[in-house]
């Protein structure tokens, strides 16, 4: 199945010169959405993960059904101030400013084997921060999963030493 048929290019969104890759058509089509989750599962099942970690918010769209498909626990990584219990955080730089991500301190433990899911690999900063959170809790990061990878932004360079898997590349 050619997933690119279900990812629309939206020029000049959210600002001039940007081509936004819209995944909503992929999500709206039940067969395509199901196949996307199946493809992600096929890529990591042999790694024998214990948890699926996903990044707010679009990573949740793929991470939760992937965890369900694999029969694993789901761990959300959220933006600052969104988790109700004790958490750890990491801040990272964006092109214009910075962001902070958090994970509950009891979400993972030493010996856990995780795959981390997000919708798009762009610069790699968000994923690198998420890897740091998981490793600080003692988990082993087995793979980093993306539906889309924007090759020109070279996000893989920030993720050296990790298994990076993307379904569609632009």
Swiss-Prot record:
One of its GO terms (biological process) is purine ribonucleoside salvage. Signal peptide: none annotated. Pfam families: Pribosyltran. It is found in: Cytoplasm. It catalyses: AMP + diphosphate = 5-phospho-alpha-D-ribose 1-diphosphate + adenine. Keywords: Cytoplasm, Glycosyltransferase, Purine salvage, Transferase. Its main location: cytoplasm. GO terms for cellular component: cytoplasm. InterPro entries: Ade_phspho_trans (IPR005764), PRibTrfase_dom (IPR000836), PRTase-like (IPR029057), UPRTase/APRTase (IPR050054). SUPFAM superfamilies: PRTase-like. Its EC number is 2.4.2.7. Homodimer. Catalyzes a salvage reaction resulting in the formation of AMP, that is energically less costly than de novo synthesis. Belongs to the purine/pyrimidine phosphoribosyltransferase family. NCBIfam families: apt, PRK02304.1-2, PRK02304.1-3, PRK02304.1-5. This is Adenine phosphoribosyltransferase. It comes from Carboxydothermus hydrogenoformans (strain ATCC BAA-161 / DSM 6008 / Z-2901). The lineage of its organism: Bacteria, Bacillati, Bacillota, Clostridia, Thermoanaerobacterales. The gene is apt.
